From Swiss-Prot:
Cystines in this chain: none
Family, as annotated: Belongs to the FAIM1 family.
Keywords: Apoptosis, Cytoplasm
UniProt main location, coarse: cytoplasm
GO biological process assignments: apoptotic process; negative regulation of extrinsic apoptotic signaling pathway via death domain receptors; positive regulation of canonical NF-kappaB signal transduction; positive regulation of neurogenesis
TM annotation in the entry: none
Main function: Plays a role as an inducible effector molecule that mediates Fas resistance produced by surface Ig engagement in B cells.
Organism: Rattus norvegicus (Rat)
InterPro entries from the UniProt entry: FAIM1 (IPR010695), FAIM1_dom_sf (IPR038513)
Record-given protein name: Fas apoptotic inhibitory molecule 1
Length: 201
């Protein structure tokens, strides 16, 4: 079983039963939030067969059979930006194993902490659809449900506005100074002249 800060989230009742039947050696599941969406990473480790299988969003990325060395690592890529991910397999005692996930060379926990400083995320419902809007603060790229949006920047009296459209809805992210050095710039999503609360991660 997995342990540590980067331990997986185990299968819940919402997952289809057929995927559990198919994945008989499923040992770890992680949900990873990237700019283009939340990706589910599943790992099968057959400690008697030597099998290792990595699935990203239900699609098989890596399959290795008859691996005689049961510890090691598997490296693959996740999401539209091809973010590097590595699953580390370590023996902790006897036939017990620990599975940890690294994203861009950092533990999942450290990566998510860093990401919360470099991105803002909003979730809202528009026209009966759930939308996930992500602002990458370092590049000012805006993503909506996995698509990088066409944007137009505009300077205004109290800061900047980054405009984009979702369907027939006018949206913009307003950036204003907090006036406090430690807080920095405050980003606010406005959709149809309505402020959307930020998702806290």
């Amino acid at each position: 079983m997995a342990s540590g800060d980067d331990s997986p989230i185990f299968e819940d009742d919402e997952s289809p039963l057929c995927s559990l039947e198919k994945m008989t050696d499923l040992v770890a599941v992680w949900d990873v939030a990237l700019s283009d969406g939340v990706h589910k990473i599943e790992f099968e480790h057959g400690t008697t067969s030597g099998k290792r299988v990595v699935y990203v969003d239900g699609k098989e990325e890596i399959r290795r059979e008859w691996m005689f060395k049961l510890v090691g690592k598997e490296t693959f890529f996740v999401g539209a930006a091809k973010t590097k991910a590595t699953i580390n397999i370590d023996a902790i005692s006897g036939f017990a194993y620990e599975y940890t996930l690294e994203i861009d060379g950092k533990s999942l926990k450290k990566y998510m902490e860093n990401r919360s400083k470099t991105t803002n995320t909003w979730v809202l419902h528009l026209d009966g659809e759930e939308l996930r809007v992500v602002l990458e603060k370092d590049t000012m790229d805006v993503w909506c449900n996995g698509q990088r949006m066409e944007t137009a920047g505009e300077f205004v009296d109290d800061g900047t506005e980054t405009h984009f459209s979702v369907g027939n809805h006018d949206c913009y992210i307003k950036a204003v100074s907090s006036g406090k050095r430690r807080e920095g710039i405050i980003h606010t999503l406005i959709v149809d002249n309505r402020e959307i609360p930020e998702l806290t991660q």
